[in-house]
Amino acid sequence: MEQRRPWPRALEVDSRSVVLLSVVWVLLAPPAAGMPQFSTFHSENRDWTFNHLTVHQGTGAVYVGAINRVYKLTGNLTIQVAHKTGPEEDNKSCYPPLIVQPCSEVLTLTNNVNKLLIIDYSENRLLACGSLYQGVCKLLRLDDLFILVEPSHKKEHYLSSVNKTGTMYGVIVRSEGEDGKLFIGTAVDGKQDYFPTLSSRKLPRDPESSAMLDYELHSDFVSSLIKIPSDTLALVSHFDIFYIYGFASGGFVYFLTVQPETPEGVAINSAGDLFYTSRIVRLCKDDPKFHSYVSLPFGCTRAGVEYRLLQAAYLAKPGDSLAQAFNITSQDDVLFAIFSKGQKQYHHPPDDSALCAFPIRAINLQIKERLQSCYQGEGNLELNWLLGKDVQCTKAPVPIDDNFCGLDINQPLGGSTPVEGLTLYTTSRDRMTSVASYVYNGYSVVFVGTKSGKLKKIRADGPPHGGVQYEMVSVLKDGSPILRDMAFSIDQRYLYVMSERQVTRVPVESCEQYTTCGECLSSGDPHCGWCALHNMCSRRDKCQQAWEPNRFAASISQCVSLAVHPSSISVSEHSRLLSLVVSDAPDLSAGIACAFGNLTEVEGQVSGSQVICISPGPKDVPVIPLDQDWFGLELQLRSKETGKIFVSTEFKFYNCSAHQLCLSCVNSAFRCHWCKYRNLCTHDPTTCSFQEGRINISEDCPQLVPTEEILIPVGEVKPITLKARNLPQPQSGQRGYECVLNIQGAIHRVPALRFNSSSVQCQNSSYQYDGMDISNLAVDFAVVWNGNFIIDNPQDLKVHLYKCAAQRESCGLCLKADRKFECGWCSGERRCTLHQHCTSPSSPWLDWSSHNVKCSNPQITEILTVSGPPEGGTRVTIHGVNLGLDFSEIAHHVQVAGVPCTPLPGEYIIAEQIVCEMGHALVGTTSGPVRLCIGECKPEFMTKSHQQYTFVNPSVLSLNPIRGPESGGTMVTITGHYLGAGSSVAVYLGNQTCEFYGRSMSEIVCVSPPSSNGLGPVPVSVSVDRAHVDSNLQFEYIDDPRVQRIEPEWSIASGHTPLTITGFNLDVIQEPRIRVKFNGKESVNVCKVVNTTTLTCLAPSLTTDYRPGLDTVERPDEFGFVFNNVQSLLIYNDTKFIYYPNPTFELLSPTGVLDQKPGSPIILKGKNLCPPASGGAKLNYTVLIGETPCAVTVSETQLLCEPPNLTGQHKVMVHVGGMVFSPGSVSVISDSLLTLPAIVSIAAGGSLLLIIVIIVLIAYKRKSRENDLTLKRLQMQMDNLESRVALECKEAFAELQTDINELTSDLDRSGIPYLDYRTYAMRVLFPGIEDHPVLRELEVQGNGQQHVEKALKLFAQLINNKVFLLTFIRTLELQRSFSMRDRGNVASLIMTGLQGRLEYATDVLKQLLSDLIDKNLENKNHPKLLLRRTESVAEKMLTNWFAFLLHKFLKECAGEPLFMLYCAIKQQMEKGPIDAITGEARYSLSEDKLIRQQIEYKTLILNCVNPDNENSPEIPVKVLNCDTITQVKEKILDAVYKNVPYSQRPRAVDMDLEWRQGRIARVVLQDEDITTKIEGDWKRLNTLMHYQVSDRSVVALVPKQTSSYNIPASASISRTSISRYDSSFRYTGSPDSLRSRAPMITPDLESGVKVWHLVKNHDHGDQKEGDRGSKMVSEIYLTRLLATKGTLQKFVDDLFETLFSTVHRGSALPLAIKYMFDFLDEQADRHSIHDTDVRHTWKSNCLPLRFWVNVIKNPQFVFDIHKGSITDACLSVVAQTFMDSCSTSEHRLGKDSPSNKLLYAKDIPSYKSWVERYYADIAKLPAISDQDMNAYLAEQSRLHAVEFNMLSALNEIYSYVSKYSEELIGALEQDEQARRQRLAYKVEQLINAMSIES
């Protein structure tokens, strides 16, 4: 599901306000269902839709005009600037607008629609025009969208108040060294007096020029503008001109418009009656009088269909073939345009649309011809809308050339003959809405957007094919239309596509989708060719060495092909030489490997284009499946140069012995031979024992040949003679022939006699089969010899056994039997039999050979259709026995109820069925039987029915329902009498047939057709056979139902959750249903009509077999409604309906049975119990204990069931949506009844207890009097405490509500002080070490510098040897003296040393991690402990690796929310008192750092003198009167130097704080001086309250004096007078500040005096009773933790959401994260670890806990800041929450849990779901190839290769080589690869070289 990200904050360049900016949302998650992944940018507000888009052709910046905003984006759609343009208070009726003069109209907050967005390249500015204030424009600086000018004080500045986008277009024309001109066309919405529809305006280079946007020429007689005449608007009230596109070409400016036609003298007041025409308007660039105005209609046609409604257009150059078709050059301009069909409904155009092309040269030629004809006096000016009448052309002898710009006659000029374009492509379904084109490799490539959010890619070749669509891409999953503006990136590799709410960057090609050369080169994409040795489809420039022969194939004939000889071998042939011929291959001299599928790979011998390979050995030959005689696999050639398989062909292994019959053997596709006498198939003919027994062709196989059908009557003894071919003569020792028959599963073997090689006979035998329901049984049989050698039966000959009597009980059925059976009717025995079995001599045996044979005694058994109308036409079906043997026998002898009924030949079934059609009955005929004769009407051939046929008169009474939707599909029921009579019925609604559904005697049901005449009533007519039933009924067609809203817009995968559908006319649907389609499968569920506007539905399941993952949110491919026949709602696009995963439950207990005590709640644990959907809808759970429901309470992970009062064992069932789940059973055990001894004991004990209670009561009464006074005293204390608790809670609540707004507005988001890369890396790698050797050049004492450097370069070679480096690290880790600190140090040194070779470092790191995982699992450690602690070099290297590769991500994305969180914590802490000694604060997230008593304080504003310029305004600084002087200094420094990095600021300890009282009197304030209060052994630090500093006092920070001085003796000042600052005391004798005495040495060490600030140390017992009282029940103050947490919540959320998102401001997820997570998944797969918790934990330990937690706790690693102790404590709480969010363990909390855990208890489940989704999203991203990763690592290495000194790092690493040299050399000598590379020797060389120098 698409999830919208919050918009981060940034400064906006608009001078009027600062706004919140959007984060770019980059889609890298997989679309559901095949959705491509593109960079996207979304609107920050759903209602602020995008309007225009343009791309700067120099910088590649993307500018987007939207409602209320103009955005500047980078090429990859990362936002840079958002410029606010609205909303503002306005009213369209205010003219001039209220920004010029006050307006009396009612003002409302009005959106500003961007209508024009043009780049003025020569002046580096952007022209943006909106709809506010009558359509004023702004000129914005391109770099930062700073407003250069916003002209608005003249009427020329108001372009149009139309607030609809797509109605205005502008073209900037600029001549060298001159001011520019802006040609602008706009719709005016009837305000023709205020706004011209077309004008040219001045565009001075100076933005402040008073002539800005003035008309180029404006006088009383002639102007550079055209207005719509009021007469035209009087004639056509909705007349307006919509400007769709504009451009400059040659010396002209062109506009493409759509406008209504204006018929002469006919007024049109309805917009629906308008006919629109699309026109080309041309003006000369240098024609301020507009004399050159020419307007011609244009469009195109195909197959007689006219396309006249312009939708979009684009000017481009033609490709070679298109230029040739137009007879122009490739440098000429061609206009590509999209039109919709017809000329009506411009604002709702038809889907039928066309892409057409117009050469500008052809347009100019037609305009020239129009001008010439008019100047010859032919016809009229034909511009009715502007001239109002027919104006005759004036003849003038004026030469008109290609550059003619008009005179003051014959202008403005129109025309009626359209400019016809070449139709390239049409579609009738998905209307095309936008177009863009460019030329690639000589081809015109056209990109067309559609109304359903798809992008068509079309190659425009010109005739005869026109345009060929070669690809279609789904850009917008929500199916919203693509808007007109599309633009290419400057490198033309991407196309920017825009919908109302999304800008998308789509690659112009996606060649990589084609995986074979054939697919690639037959795709039709001109960008794509086949990169042969890399086996990929790509552009030519992405294919390495594409210029070399056959490296890059551009046509399908150039594809590399492979032929192998032989193409197949037997499975028994091993290691055979195969000859492979490679056609069209590049140079293969680098080497080839032959791969046989995944079985084996061998070296190939290359000779030119021939390769010799050896087939697999016996161990590698594939096993052939039992039912096959061959197995094919891919024989692939792998290039050793690229490592890629670049060509393959099928190679087959065959097995002849799989064939059991001769024909299948010799007809096999392989070289198989049949051994006739051994009855086996073999690939080796030499294995046949007899030469003459070897068969190679099918003609030589022993086989049965076709003969006449073998018919055997059951019980008859008969031989079976068969024809054959090549029957073998059994050899000595071999048995003879047999016939084997399989009769109903029983095998019958009959001896057979071979007459010769072509004849065999099964001996005499009789055969039987069971049952009289089978008249003819086909029996499989085979001829075998020698026991089981089968003779082939290629024609599948069968023996047919039959019984004459079976299913032939009557004469008719008997004689109807096929004559081949020779069956006949034995009259005497009344049975069907063979002639020889009819033994009765007196009765004849009838068969077809008998003369004039007829069956007597016909019978009618049933009549179907027993009633009908007297008008006739009813078809009556008669079933019976002996109903004739030929149609002629019954053709004229059927009557029904006395009325002739005509039999129908086509319906006649011999002897069994007659169907006849009734004639017209005479008046008065009512009923009667059916009578018929067979041939002749003699008694023995006549019969009549027992059933009666009745004549009835059908009638209709009513109709239900009486209305239905226009699209039809309504089930209409017509009630009446005798409606079930007759054989057919027809119902008509108007002139259309109502589709028959069913009927009975009282009603007819049919389905209404779509209306052919629109809405309204239609008559209902009914016909029954030939009877027309009178009816006055009417059926009304009404508007189809419409759906407006679905609530909620979600369900779970199993569906069946309730949905409420709101819309119109919903009650006309009889059986509404709701449907979804997902992965090609459809699911439907039922709805119920509530009323005309409301339905209730049950959500369909996603699919019956869908099993979503725990974190999967799916969007169906289609969502809609089955509403009768309403097709428009089958797919409903106005919804974002999504499916959440099904809830899952754990078992109640491992055994499945949970023991419960009565009344105890049952807790069901699970996941996904509460889908995180917005709105109030929740899942409705029903829990049954047995059959009894229980009350349910639901949370995210558990379901609490209050059980009914039951005992015994009961099954628990959970119902939710369409799910039913049983987590087990509960066994409720009641307490057992008490025994008699127990009851006696309890009674005795109770008596004793009662006596004791009486005694205690007497004592208590006496004592209670004494306690009354104490109780009253305690009550007073409790009342006092209660009021203080209430006050504290009230304050905490008020803070919680107000502080978030205050904090958000206070924070300054400018200038984040990022550390440079080197400092950042050092703080992460070597924390606490500021000046590390790796930052300096290597320094060697003495003269050995060169030798040491030489030795270290040798060491560098060793370090770059993977075998050495791995052995080195493993050896160090085995040493006991190699401490944890050493491990971290070595890991950091290695990473700094390999900074320039990160590919190699990554390879080593992966190997170390793989070893670590192996070791972890071998030691039987729990897999979740992996990477938990830094106990190995690999773990620290992993941290450093992420530190290197995530630096860019930190700066561009994650750094901002982290810095904002730090600032928020710091600022929030400083808003309340902070104890300077203990670090405790009023506002804190940490319980340990919370002041737990009431501190009275006031906020003061101090005015600080600007230290840089004392004459500039003073800087106000917020402080607290309880702050110490040092705290005040730090706050002042923060305010004065707020945008200065901490390291560049002065330190508070180096500055003095002066309090200035007047111009001369200055007092230096200090934490400790002679005025400091000392009480007993406690000394309190001085605060502003102590000095009685008042609000708005003036202070200054001055550098600290080098030496203090004492107060002069002459000024005998008492201590009290200083502390009170009497007004009488002013020291004016010196310009220096008066300094209090220098602070004393901390007295704790000298005299036992303890210093305090706000609270004394809690452990001291000398506090006053009042102090202790103020701290009693300190937990009260924990509510402040909650207040602080609420204040900071948004900043924590922002940080977590950024870190747990795969989409970040347009930048992809850092490759390092995806690459490392995939590596961990691979390792889990390798070790068969399928536990998702383990995988989750590995990833959490790897990145969040290893890197992010470190950064969160230590923001000073990333930023140049100071982190105080209270800030550190709060960050630690956030970091702990972050760690808890990544954990998979259950979050169990109780009243004794730490407060920081309780603080975020409710948030952590949500954060956990973010983490799970984050990991799942990463897993779905496409894998990063090693090639892409290495390229990325190489780039990172290049960027930072010189940050650290390599030799210094190596020198530091060498110290470990030196320390453990013996162990290292020993390990190298034991390693085989190290021995082969003589690494131990090289180490000894290194040690010797370094030792010499030392």
UniProtKB/Swiss-Prot annotation:
Give me the disulphide-bonded residues: 94-103, 129-137, 284-405, 300-356, 374-393, 511-528, 517-559, 520-537, 531-543, 594-613
Q: Which residues form a coiled coil?
A: 1261-1310
Q: Which residues lie on this side of the membrane: Cytoplasmic?
A: 1259-1894
Residue ranges that the UniProt entry lists as topological domain Extracellular: 35-1237
InterPro entries of this UniProt entry?
Ig-like_fold, Ig_E-set, IPT_dom, Plexin, Plexin-A2_sema, Plexin_cytoplasmic_RasGAP_dom, Plexin_RBD, Plexin_repeat
- The stretch of residues making up the signal peptide is 1-34
Name the family the entry cites.
Belongs to the plexin family.
Instruction: Give the protein's function.
Output: Coreceptor for SEMA3A and SEMA6A. Necessary for signaling by SEMA6A and class 3 semaphorins and subsequent remodeling of the cytoskeleton. Plays a role in axon guidance, invasive growth and cell migration. Class 3 semaphorins bind to a complex composed of a neuropilin and a plexin. The plexin modulates the affinity of the complex for specific semaphorins, and its cytoplasmic domain is required for the activation of down-stream signaling events in the cytoplasm.
Q: How does it assemble?
A: Homodimer. The PLXNA2 homodimer interacts with a SEMA6A homodimer, giving rise to a heterotetramer. Interacts directly with NRP1 and NRP2. Interacts with RND1.
> Which protein is depicted?
Plexin-A2
Q: What is the originating organism of this protein?
A: Homo sapiens (Human)
Query: Which gene is the coding source of this polypeptide chain?
Result: PLXNA2
